[in-house]
Amino acid sequence: MLIIIRPSGEIALKSPRSRRNFEHTLANNIRSVIKEGKIWRSQGVLFLEVNDDNKNIEELSKVFGIASFSPVMSIKSYNNNLEDIINKAKEVFAEIVKGKIFSVRAKRIGSHNFTSLDVQRKVGEALYPFSRGVNLENPEVEVFIEIRNDVAYFYHKIIKGPKGLPVGVAGKTVVLFSGGIDSPVATWMMMKRGSIPVILNFNLGGSIHRKFVLEELSVLRKWSGGHKLKLFIVNGTDVLIKLSQIEKRNRVVMLKRVMYKVAERLCDKANAKSITTGESLSQVSSQTMTNLYVTEYGIKYPIFRPLIGFDKEEIVELARKIGTYQYSIKLPEYCAISTKARTSVELDEVLKDEENLNIDYEKVLENSEVIEI
């Protein structure tokens, strides 16, 4: 089976050098995902030759950087002969348009002795006897002919890809991954922008927490463009014991700050250039603007919050689409360690608590469990 793959539109807008780099990364990601067949680039698209099965279609639909793709039939060389194209179109499309209202869409790259309109008209005339009629505005079925120099491609399906950028073109980001509904969606959104996530999980729920985090990451792995996901699991219980020394109402913000500090160390270790969280403005007490300011104060890496303007319904909708919702919904809210958390914590208080607690963030990270998925 031959598949034509159309990269995301924004890739085409890059400089020639960047475009080559992005298309090269996309091709490598596809190779990693499909693991068989042959792939090559040509005039702004990619071609993939694989065994004829639906598994490849499903896998391609989760590769970031792909706008759409189509399984195609082709004439290798037709010597600029429109009659050859018409005959092949009848062979490929006669059953597809049978008893249906149809339209023909054609486009060309290269020099030919006919126009795209000629192709549409002549092929339409040839297919008309098999059909129930033609309607260019609202057809029941569309058939496509794409002529690239001396090769013509025939297809009737355009399968949507996830768009975005190929995973790997934007470097690494450390993701604070609780395993709730939000953090897997934030991870997915950063992968969509080309970033490789390094996962940092504070385990506050033992084996159950660990189990569901691993299941969520196995789902996200299908969207990673073949890149392995590295997971660092920190023993969060030890951190909670430390936090019991400070005022209850400050503990949630302080816990988040500890997470940021450990993430900062992991950025150093993993050569990541940012920290990503699933925080959404004012969704919970620790995510008010004041508390977010306090939480990230003094952190040297930029903090990305891809969900900052999303409401919960929008996040849930994305989680369902990604496939992580069914696992996230089973997890308790482990970070809710105080019933009377403050919506406006004073920075001076938190910095004083931090000094008194004197947590060794390097040691916390060193004692983490590392899993590659």
UniProtKB/Swiss-Prot annotation:
Give the Enzyme Commission number.
2.8.1.4
Main enzyme class: transferase
Binding site residues for ATP? L176, F177, N201, F202, K256, G278, Q287
Which InterPro entries does the entry link to? Rossmann-like_a/b/a_fold, ThiI_AANH, ThiI_fer, ThiI_N, THUMP_dom, THUMP_ThiI, tRNA_STrfase, tRNA_sulfurtransferase_ThiI
**The reaction(s) this protein catalyses:** [ThiI sulfur-carrier protein]-S-sulfanyl-L-cysteine + a uridine in tRNA + 2 reduced [2Fe-2S]-[ferredoxin] + ATP + H(+) = [ThiI sulfur-carrier protein]-L-cysteine + a 4-thiouridine in tRNA + 2 oxidized [2Fe-2S]-[ferredoxin] + AMP + diphosphate; [ThiS sulfur-carrier protein]-C-terminal Gly-Gly-AMP + S-sulfanyl-L-cysteinyl-[cysteine desulfurase] + AH2 = [ThiS sulfur-carrier protein]-C-terminal-Gly-aminoethanethioate + L-cysteinyl-[cysteine desulfurase] + A + AMP + 2 H(+)
Q: Which GO terms describe its cellular component?
A: cytosol
Where is this chain's protein located in or outside the cell?
Cytoplasm
Q: Which organism is it from?
A: Saccharolobus islandicus (strain M.16.4 / Kamchatka #3) (Sulfolobus islandicus)
Q: Name one GO biological process term.
A: thiamine diphosphate biosynthetic process
KW Repeat (keyword) present: no
The pathway to which it is assigned is:
Cofactor biosynthesis; thiamine diphosphate biosynthesis
The alphabetized UniProt keywords are: ATP-binding, Cytoplasm, Nucleotide-binding, RNA-binding, Thiamine biosynthesis, Transferase, tRNA-binding
SMART domains hit by this protein: THUMP
Q: What does this protein do?
A: Catalyzes the ATP-dependent transfer of a sulfur to tRNA to produce 4-thiouridine in position 8 of tRNAs, which functions as a near-UV photosensor. Also catalyzes the transfer of sulfur to the sulfur carrier protein ThiS, forming ThiS-thiocarboxylate. This is a step in the synthesis of thiazole, in the thiamine biosynthesis pathway. The sulfur is donated as persulfide by IscS.
Residue span, THUMP domain: 54-158
Protein name as catalogued: Probable tRNA sulfurtransferase
Which Gene Ontology terms cover its molecular function?
Answer: ATP binding; CCA tRNA nucleotidyltransferase activity; tRNA binding; tRNA-uracil-4 sulfurtransferase activity
Q: Which Gene3D superfamilies match?
A: 3.30.2130.30, HUPs
Q: Which domain of life is it from?
A: Archaea
- Major place of localization? cytoplasm
What Pfam families does this protein's entry cite? ThiI, ThiI_fer, THUMP
Gene encoding it? Answer: thiI
What protein family does this chain belong to?
Answer: Belongs to the ThiI family.
The record's annotation in CDD domains points to: PPase_ThiI (cd01712), THUMP_ThiI (cd11716)
